[in-house]
């Protein structure tokens, strides 16, 4: 995203970059762009070619990968040209298109993380009922909603820019506006509200999972002296869930959900007969789940929070930042599109197998 307040040419004046600096910056950004493109393409191809991954939850991840791929293909390359050349030389129309695509795709990527968290929350806390509702149509509706909200958040500047008497300097390509209300509206809608919702959802997911781990431990202890079929029935009964295997295994929250798919317990499993051992296993799983959630939330917050803090303080005329700082924070946000395909697939064995198949085919 490239949003800034109106500034004078003097205030925008910066020290020209040396050839060496431009080369280093260009190489770094090209590597980021290339990796982002390849990783998101790999996710899309893995889901498209692997029947086992054709699940509603994975459709959300695929849509996220498509959105991040658009950031890598349509947004990052023009940003590299703009940064390296220190000025915009591609014309007013292309500038307008680039800024609109930038804001829409980045906002959409953030909102995808929100609906993925919501999908996982429902899958954990309302498993039986949501398993019936978790369909491809529902996933498509969630994706359509995300894109609609993103467009409503990012498009308003187009209308007032088209009515401005003075066009922005041809050497600049930034959204120049003095609309404080829009600054608040866009930052709240694109980041702060989704961030709040994501934090609440993952907090509740963790506590729900922790409770379910404890119930699973209790059900195992009570069913150790039953037959295998009796164990399966009793465990399902005690956990108030059902024995299924169609939960999405692509989620990093798989550690939370997978006990639904593996309720069957070997008879006379004396290894788990001691409360201390059961508690240790439960504690290990809780720590692993906490680490996964910490990675997801940490990557998202570290990538986008600095940018949106800058947007508020600059948009509200509290403080101004140099173009170098603005570019760095913008690309820090773009890096989230590189991290997403790693975080949302690397904890799942089905995705790992699909990636291995893709690599073997290329070899």
Swiss-Prot record:
CDD domains: 7tmA_5-HT1E (cd15335). It is a multi-pass membrane protein. It is found in: Cell membrane. One of its GO terms (molecular function) is neurotransmitter receptor activity. Glycans are attached at residues 2, 5. Keywords: Cell membrane, Disulfide bond, G-protein coupled receptor, Glycoprotein, Membrane, Receptor, Transducer, Transmembrane, Transmembrane helix. A motif (NPxxY motif) lies at residues 340-344. One of its GO terms (cellular component) is dendrite. Residues 1-21, 85-92, 158-179, 317-322 are extracellular. This is 5-hydroxytryptamine receptor 1E.
